[in-house]
């Protein structure tokens, strides 16, 4: 009996410890989203062909980079010193130990470093290092133990893996192909379809590449476009030739890890309208170190309709802790890596054929999937690495990148965003000016045919933590009563961090001076940011304004007294004020402050000048 009592007390203590841990975790989640990485299993095991290597989780600050393909024109100064011989050279010559186990290569000789620097612009990554790493290099076991122990149903659907490339490096393209072959069950891999978007590198042309791929132990098809068509149309070319039950799209500079495919196909077997994406791990563009990605972020978008990664809402994070292998609902997908039932892809309307080259197709497909009865998900048990480049080596043939992107995003807004398209046009007037020349009637008819839901439904049910204006919000500029020409603003520092500031009010509709005072009493702006306060020292008075990702902390909530225009922070009881001295010529950003509320201090009084983003109706 005594032993039983001791065991009972031990269990009780464990429960208390766990409860305290869970409470503390949830309290810190919003500000420290990266802490979730450490709660994931950080043990890096070995797959069947690798040596164990330590891999650091990728930093959140590096994770806003979009999985991209055709991001803009290669500057002339980068093209100038690249000879035809350099562009067409295939210098693949692997070293025995380079990159094994996902390790990075950083210790180059002076001669190697000089060559690496001179050829970096060819593909906007370290070509010398990539060419020195085996196309069948080993990778560590990335998955957490609960994922490794999972079993999957029999008779999973087969997949066609579609990889589009344009002037891709030989080593990264072959490494992508081999990783698919080596780490996919043979019975599930129907074929690999390579779509050449009019490459002009000799080693990618017929018959050189065809001869290289012919001995590989899987069915590989190469489709070559006779002109440059861009990612969107090239993917549709591949989809039209596919024979697998499922289409799996990958970029041409990826590495699949062990167990990457089964979770994707299982999810589609269970729900044919699910569109699952793997967790995207990071392959460093300089060292090619394989770094584990963050499993607790999901896709969103900012006011410019640019894809972004944002932390899960607290309630979702809490739920995910209870089932860390379960799918994560994502409002949008990055677009480079995902699987979709082939018949469902066709029923849903494939890609929008009116979109050109690259840009916005991931948002268009995400909105369409969600609004028309499907779901976009990220699967924590599926990991695929991707080389994240800081810029693109490719161009938009015969067109400016701005015009292509604005045209594509206009199509997204016109077809899927209903009233909120007008808000996008306010933020991107250059897109609005093209509106009369773009015909989206066929896609509008598709939306009607599929009986799709409204964008309001999408915001209320899918992207509930969005930061677009709604009728419940007060939206516009916040001006200081002490100086009506001074506006609350945010400023992008050289470090890439956005900070709260005050600035001369602009006469134009500019997102850096636009704020939402929401129905739940938060002051929000673009990029999922909230005006908050942070305590610098452990005193009751030393508080500072902070612009941070919204997380639902009580430091983010402000009670507004409209008669006097005062914002009082709920956590501290302090009032928002413009700086003591406003000097727009200073290098500093004239940050707002919080201080003890005083009725005589007009710097604590603010006026919300509401701005209309909807068109006026007669």
Curated annotation (Swiss-Prot):
Domain named Ricin B-type lectin: residues: 474-609
Keywords of the record: Disulfide bond, Glycoprotein, Glycosyltransferase, Golgi apparatus, Lectin, Manganese, Membrane, Metal-binding, Signal-anchor, Transferase, Transmembrane, Transmembrane helix
Membrane-traversing stretches: 17-39
EC number: 2.4.1.-
Lumenal topological intervals: 40-618
Disulfides per UniProt: 147-381, 372-452, 487-505, 530-550, 575-597
GO biological process: protein O-linked glycosylation
Primary localization class, coarse: Golgi
Top-level taxon of origin: Eukaryota
Cytoplasmic-side positions: 1-16
Any one GO cellular component localisation term in the record: Golgi apparatus
Pathway: Protein modification; protein glycosylation
Binding site for Mn(2+): 251, 253, 386
Cofactor section: Mn(2+)
Cell location: Golgi apparatus membrane
Region entry Catalytic subdomain A, spans: 156-267
Region (Catalytic subdomain B): 327-389
Bilayer topology term: Single-pass type II membrane protein
Keyword Transmembrane applies: yes
Positions contributing to substrate binding: 197, 228, 252, 358, 389
GO molecular function terms noted in the UniProt entry: carbohydrate binding; metal ion binding; polypeptide N-acetylgalactosaminyltransferase activity
Free-text function comment from the UniProt entry: Probable glycopeptide transferase involved in O-linked oligosaccharide biosynthesis. Glycopeptide transferases catalyze the transfer of an N-acetyl-D-galactosamine residue to an already glycosylated peptide. In contrast to other members of the family, it does not act as a peptide transferase that transfers GalNAc onto serine or threonine residue on peptides that have been tested. Some peptide transferase activity is however not excluded, considering that its appropriate peptide substrate may remain unidentified.
Domain-level remarks: There are two conserved domains in the glycosyltransferase region: the N-terminal domain (domain A, also called GT1 motif), which is probably involved in manganese coordination and substrate binding and the C-terminal domain (domain B, also called Gal/GalNAc-T motif), which is probably involved in catalytic reaction and UDP-Gal binding.
Entry similarity comment: Belongs to the glycosyltransferase 2 family. GalNAc-T subfamily.
Protein name as it appears in the record: Probable N-acetylgalactosaminyltransferase 6
Organism: Caenorhabditis elegans
Primary gene name: gly-6
């Amino acid at each position: 009996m005594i032993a039983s009592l001791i065991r009972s007390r031990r269990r009780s203590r464990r429960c208390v410890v766990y409860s305290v841990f869970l409470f503390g975790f949830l309290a810190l989640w919003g500000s420290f989203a990266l802490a979730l990485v450490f709660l994931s299993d950080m043990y890096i095991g070995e797959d069947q062909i690798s040596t164990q290597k330590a891999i650091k989780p990728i930093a959140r600050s590096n994770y806003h980079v979009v999985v991209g393909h055709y991001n803009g024109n290669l500057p002339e100064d980068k093209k100038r010193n690249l000879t035809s011989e350099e562009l067409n050279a295939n210098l693949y010559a692997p070293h025995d130990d380079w990159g094994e186990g996902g390790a990075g290569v950083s210790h180059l000789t002076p001669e190697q470093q000089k060559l690496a620097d001179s050829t970096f612009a060819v593909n906007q990554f370290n070509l010398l290092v990539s060419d020195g790493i085996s196309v069948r290099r080993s990778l560590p076991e990335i998955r957490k133990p609960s994922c490794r122990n999972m079993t999957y149903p029999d008779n999973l659907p087969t997949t066609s893996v579609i990889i589009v490339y344009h002037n891709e490096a030989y080593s990264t393209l072959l490494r992508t192909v081999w990783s698919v072959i080596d780490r996919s069950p043979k019975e599930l891999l129907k074929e690999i379809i390579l779509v050449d978007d009019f490459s002009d590198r000799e080693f990618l042309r017929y018959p050189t590449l065809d001869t290289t791929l012919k001995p590989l132990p899987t069915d590989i098809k190469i489709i070559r476009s006779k002109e440059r068509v861009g990612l969107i149309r090239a993917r549709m070319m591949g989809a039209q030739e596919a024979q697998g039950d499922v289409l799996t799209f990958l970029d041409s500079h990826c590495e699949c890890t062990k167990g990457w495919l089964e979770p994707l196909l299982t999810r589609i077997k269970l729900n044919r309208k699910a569109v699952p994406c793997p967790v995207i791990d990071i392959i460093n563009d300089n060292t090619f170190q394989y770094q584990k990605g963050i499993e607790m972020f999901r896709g969103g978008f900012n006011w410019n309709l640019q894809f972004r990664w944002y932390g899960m809402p607290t309630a979702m994070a809490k739920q995910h802790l209870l089932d860390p292998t379960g799918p994560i609902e994502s409002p949008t997908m990055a677009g480079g890596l995902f699987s979709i039932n082939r018949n469902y892809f066709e029923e849903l309307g494939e890609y929008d054929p009116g979109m050109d080259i690259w840009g916005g197709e991931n948002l268009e497909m995400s909105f369409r999937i969600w609004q028309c009865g499907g779901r976009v998900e990220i699967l924590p048990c599926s990991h695929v690495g991707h080389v994240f480049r800081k810029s693109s080596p490719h161009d938009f043939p015969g067109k400016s990148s701005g015009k292509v992107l604005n045209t594509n995003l206009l199509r997204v807004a016109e077809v899927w965003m209903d009233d909120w398209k007008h808000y996008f046009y306010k933020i991107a007037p250059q897109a609005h000016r093209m509106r009369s020349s773009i015909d989206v009637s066929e896609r509008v008819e598709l939306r009607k045919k599929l009986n799709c839901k409204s964008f309001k439904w999408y915001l209320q049910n899918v992207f509930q933590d969005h930061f677009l204006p709604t009728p419940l919000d007060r939206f516009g500029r916040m001006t200081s009563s002490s100086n009506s020409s001074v506006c609350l603003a945010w400023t992008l520092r050289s470090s890439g961090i956005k900070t709260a500031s005050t600035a001369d009010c602009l006469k134009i509709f500019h997102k850096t001076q636009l704020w939402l005072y929401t129905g739940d009493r938060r002051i929000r702006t673009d990029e999922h940011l909230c005006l908050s306060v942070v305590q610098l020292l452990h005193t009751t008075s030393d508080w500072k304004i902070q612009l941070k990702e919204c997380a639902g902390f009580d430091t983010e909530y402000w009670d507004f007294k409209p008669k006097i225009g005062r914002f009082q922070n709920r956590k501290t009881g302090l009032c928002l004020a413009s700086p003591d001295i406003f000097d727009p010529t200073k290098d500093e950003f004239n940050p707002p402050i919080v201080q003890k509320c005083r009725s005589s201090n007009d710097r604590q009084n603010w006026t919300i000048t509401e701005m209309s983003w909807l068109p006026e109706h007669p």
